[in-house]
Amino acid sequence: MLTLRFVSGSIEVHGEAPDGLTLPPLPHAAHDDRAGCLRAPAVAYADIVRTLVRAKVPFIDEARRYEQLDLKVRAAREPRPFQTEAIDAWRAAHGRGVVVLPTGSGKTHVAMMAIAEKQRSTLVVAPTLDLVRQWYDLLGSTFGHPIGLIGGGEHKVLPLTVTTYDSAHLHMDHLGSRFGFVIFDECHHLPSGAYAHAALACLAPFRLGLTATPERTDGRDFRTLVGPIVYRKEIGDLAGEYLASYDTETIAISLSAEERAAYDEARGTYRAFIEKHHIRMGDPAGWGTFIRLSAGSTEGQEAMRAYRRQRELAFTAPAKMQYLGHLLHQHRGDQLIIFTQDNASAYRIAREFLLPVITHQTKVRERSHILKGFTARTYGAIVTSKVLNEGVDVPDASVAIIVSGSGSVREHVQRLGRILRKRAGKQALLYELVTEATAEGYVSERRRDHDAYR
């Protein structure tokens, strides 16, 4: 008799098919000489079971340790039509796949509907502790059950549990058999190196990925890890009815003659170095190559200083700071989020305009205090670098000002999403401040290559 076992993030298949039956090829399984059995990554569990059932080969399943639950939704609300469509599409894909919905449109409600339907032990994986806390609270209020938590110094495993990607990667080798349903929030993180292990080492037959921005520049996808994209709506599909209506405005900022000369000189030094060494900054490895080569010579160190100088001139030009002050005055009755590309720019703006600032260096208690003050309108504006791009609910924000940013389409769409939470009479507005005739122009064009900006 065949026996399936879960061992260290993998499925072991022991024994042989009964006489008269032929064991079919099992998906992703290969013979492990040391263990004397077939072995496959745990993610292949459902496919292996399906293959054996179809071939009518009997087996003993010692792998799965998850429970059938009896969850009741405490205060069910009518789903929006697109949420019902998303669940229908996911169900049609046998409970595996990715749902793409804009920030603020109710992705988490889709997840609650899926949990209530499948009634299996469920693990929710999220990228940040802030998001983990939001899921923890939402699961508890929705189902009225104790919720497990792994991460941030906690380690309590229950039939409904929330964890971070980092903790899931570390613990899935021994927890991967305890959940029949796994939800990956912000699942565009999932294909990244170690994070993929969290999906590969889990045997959950049912999987749901949630994201507003599924595309990755490295070409990796999540079909094997969680399933294909089964449903998709963009910001433009939902704006006005389910998301706030919005406008975007790009403001051209000019350098002074003196700043222009300094920028051109620094830019020239930097460009000369990367051209001399044939460094392609558009390639995924370009930045790492530049760092490595610039550290090895005086010429390279000068190129790195020049690179930082030209960025500083473009990111925080005096005219840009002046226009930012104008916008702060113009929108003094609104709730604003000011985004920058780096911490130095964020701290400079915070000092100049006496605004609270949140970066990855901000302590949890201080960050919580600032966000509560923003919600209570004690603070009319907050400054941040990248840490608020995703995973923090700021429903009162209605104006975003992009002082600087990367060329990432995902980042730009995420920043727009911060201000699109629907509220009666709300008209959201995103400003992008771009220093003319600098690399910012090209970066702006790249990041605005999305339907939300057309």
Predicted ranges, named:
Residues 188-247, 265, 272:
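Post-DEXD/H (motif II) to motif III coupling segment of the RecA-like Helicase ATP-binding lobe
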Residues 1-85:
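Accessory DNA-engaging acidic/polar modules
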Residues 418-447:
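Conserved segment of the helicase C-terminal RecA-like domain
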Residues 93-115:
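Walker A/P-loop
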Residues 177-180, 383, 390-406, 411, ...:
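A short beta-strand element within the Helicase C-terminal
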Residues 285-363, 367-369:
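Conserved helicase/translocase motor-coupling segment
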Residues 151-181, 192-197, 387:
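Conserved helix/coil segment N-terminal to the catalytic DExD/H
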Residues 133, 144-157, 335-339, 344-350, ...:
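Conserved helicase ATPase core of P-loop NTP-dependent helicases/translocases
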